[in-house]
């Protein structure tokens, strides 16, 4: 359940830069904006074309592309916790990480060629593609973060409670201590 800001009465308070979900207060990280061409359209990348596919692997379900590139501020290096991606103020994805900067700068925001193929990180491809699609549809894409060591439990709880459209699993319940 998402609550209104008690101070300003907004669900996603632009004044507090906070988002309250259940009893957790997430801090605003950034607006996700892909790298752009001079005409304002997102640059498209096809990293799978750079992969030396010696084992003749097939592309994974989300590996075809195109993909985009984006990053977040380096100050989020080594920040452990739970993040949410909102598209036009709807929570579309909940995830956990042990380093938010790496998750977005080197995971979702910069697709490595190997991840496009079977056995690679297909989630990175899927989330990047979803972000690119949302951006091309002129939707607002925001990232919020909750710093916590209880990331597996909170991620699982929120995915179950929110039924987010981009999550394909319920997190990692086996890692909940």
Model-identified regions with their sequence ranges:
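Boundary/linker segments flanking structured domains
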Residues: 1-92, 96-177
């Amino acid at each position: 359940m998402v609550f209104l800001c008690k101070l300003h009465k907004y669900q996603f308070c632009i004044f507090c830069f906070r988002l309250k979900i259940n009893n957790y207060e997430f801090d605003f990280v950034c607006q996700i904006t892909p790298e752009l061409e001079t005409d304002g359209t997102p640059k498209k990348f096809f990293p799978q074309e750079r992969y030396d596919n010696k084992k003749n692997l097939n592309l994974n379900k989300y590996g075809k592309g195109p993909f985009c590139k984006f990053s977040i501020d380096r100050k989020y290096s080594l920040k452990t916790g739970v993040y949410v991606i909102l598209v036009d103020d709807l929570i579309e994805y909940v995830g956990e990480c042990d380093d938010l900067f790496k998750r977005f700068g080197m995971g979702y925001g910069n697709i490595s060629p190997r991840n496009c193929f079977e056995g690679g990180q297909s989630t990175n491809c899927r989330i990047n593609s979803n972000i690119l699609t949302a951006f091309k549809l002129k939707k607002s894409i925001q990232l919020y973060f909750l710093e916590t060591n209880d990331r597996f439990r909170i991620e699982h709880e929120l995915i179950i409670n929110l039924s987010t459209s981009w999550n394909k699993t319920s997190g990692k319940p086996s890692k909940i201590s």
